[in-house]
């Protein structure tokens, strides 16, 4: 699926399969797909100066590694002492830089709608300064990032689609605009 493809792109770019920067060398459970071996990365003239692979499912392990890699020059943000959403957003914000390459796998899993809006602002600003993002998301908030190319995975095909054509947008809009009718229909059948 989408997360497998994102992971393969991350590994092909040299990121740790569990997440982090290209400098992260750890493995708690090696389960990544061999798809990365079949991907050939074609790079353009610009080289990213920084990058990060952030995935909700292995965030705890990455936060632990962040603490282990901390030193005097790069103190720990003490992610385990914060709420899940606060630590996830802080880690993302601490690692976003212009001209970077970022791969985010379902970041909304850890974030409230308000924190998703905060992340949207950060992503938008970094993208305007040359950063490139690949984000797998079901969040209609994050799908709404201005000027984003949205790819939909439907019936075995991958294609560009408009924001309003995404299932996440359509289902959310339907629920918000017809909540009671939808609940009545779903819960009485």
Descriptions of predicted regions:
Residues 51, 101-103, 132:
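Residue-level preference for the first positions of well-ordered beta-strands
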Residues 5, 135-136:
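Conserved D-loop beta-strand region of ABC ATPase nucleotide-binding domains
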Residues 1-23:
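Phosphate-binding glycine-rich loops of NTP-binding sites
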Residues 23-83, 163-185:
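Conserved nucleotide-sensing/catalytic segment adjacent to the nucleotide-binding pocket
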Residues 82-106, 114-126:
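GG-anchored amphipathic helix commonly corresponding to the ABC/SMC/Rad50 NBD signature/C-loop
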């Amino acid at each position: 699926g989408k997360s497998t493809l994102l992971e393969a792109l991350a590994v092909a770019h040299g990121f740790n399969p569990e997440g982090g920067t290209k400098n992260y060398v750890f493995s708690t459970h090696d389960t990544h797909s061999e798809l990365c071996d079949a991907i050939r990365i074609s790079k353009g003239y610009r080289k990213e100066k920084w990058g990060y692979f952030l995935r909700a499912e292995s965030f705890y392990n990455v936060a632990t590694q962040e603490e282990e890699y901390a030193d005097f020059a790069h103190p720990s943000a003490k992610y385990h002492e914060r709420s899940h959403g606060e630590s996830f957003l802080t880690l993302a914000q601490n690692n976003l830089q212009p001209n970077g390459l970022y791969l985010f796998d379902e970041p909304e899993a850890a974030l409230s709608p308000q924190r998703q809006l905060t992340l949207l602002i950060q992503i938008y600003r970094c993208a305007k300064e040359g950063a490139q993002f690949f984000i797998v998301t079901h969040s209609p908030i994050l799908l709404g990032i201005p000027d984003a190319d949205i790819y939909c995975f439907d019936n075995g095909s991958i294609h560009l689609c408009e924001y309003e054509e995404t299932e996440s947008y359509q289902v959310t809009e339907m629920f918000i605009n017809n909540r009671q009718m939808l609940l009545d229909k779903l819960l009485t059948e």
